[in-house]
Amino acid sequence: MSLLRRRFVKQSVNCITFLQILAERSFSTVKIPPGRRKTTEFDKLINEAGSSGDFETVRRLLNNRIVLGSFNTSDTFKFLTNTASYSSYLEDLRRVLPQIDGGFSRKNAYDILISRLCKLGRIDDALIVIGDMSNGRLGLTPSTYHPILCSLTRKYKIEEAWRVVESMRSKSVSMDVTAYNYFLTSHCYDGELESASEVMRKIEEDGNSPDSRSYDALVLGACRAGKVEAAMAILRRMEEDGVTVLYSTHAHVITGLVEGGYYALGLEFVMAYAGKDLRLDSESFGFLAGKLVKRKRYEEAMIVVKEMVMRGLRMGDELRQFYEGNVRYDDDDEDSLVQSERECYIEQKLN
């Protein structure tokens, strides 16, 4: 990305002005104002042009925005929807995308289109577009396939997703850890630990290293399978190996403890990490309190919320209302306790 930016900086003002003059002189149903535009403005212009069927302008805008340092986003092809115009719009895009400047500009436009097609549930069309990329000798990368694998594994179409992997390999595109994580998360969400272990084996066989999301999925899987102790062991391994622990990983453990009825351990768990990361504290204490309230464990929830107040942690609207309605009237009693008595009080309440 930095190399691209340095390249753009080297472009002379005259060169950029020349591109803008060309854009203004070309026929278009969409008026393109001169000057540097924001990413959202480019997306708006592209969607206006696409909706009006002016795909020559779509092509020019896709070219010009990259030259001007404005990259495509998930909103770039928002005009492409599951309506009567879908087929004709897609064919027009397939026609103009090969005409975009080669290299990053064209590759990025294709990748964004594939992502849009997957969001619309058009997996077959996304694979057709990948075929276009391959025929056009564009460098296919694992990230090109990520939206497809994500979409299929979320819908638990695992066999279909593995067929896509076979197609990747036939085009000499290797799997990266992110691609494997989609399979891992799908299996772990359903508590399928054996299948998850098989995916982990494949990750290592391919020479990849599990990342934070890989371990996050494993913790989720252990909790969904009712093996909270195993989940906590995985979390400890992450810490020992220096792998960044995501906030969601803590949330998985808290969920497993609360759903297993281990309310005291839930508080003990969040207290063990308290004071190291203010945002983590807010997330973990708030998440635990919310879970307890939903399970109507009001007494335990009051203890957690009091802890949040004492630590000055951010509190959501629902917890704030819960606190104001149930907890603040007991503040005087809590304030009268010294630290040792307070810890004893919490232990007695939770056991």
UniProtKB/Swiss-Prot annotation:
Keywords: Mitochondrion, Repeat, Transit peptide. PROSITE patterns: PPR. Signal peptide: none annotated. Residues 1-27 form a transit peptide. Disulfide bonds: none annotated. Its main location: mitochondrion. Pfam families: PPR (PF01535), PPR_1 (PF12854). The keyword Metal-binding does not apply. It comes from the Eukaryota. It is found in: Mitochondrion. GO terms for cellular component: mitochondrion. PPR repeats lie at residues 106-140, 141-175, 176-210, 211-245, 246-280, 281-315. NCBIfam families: PPR. Belongs to the PPR family. P subfamily. This is Pentatricopeptide repeat-containing protein At2g40240, mitochondrial.
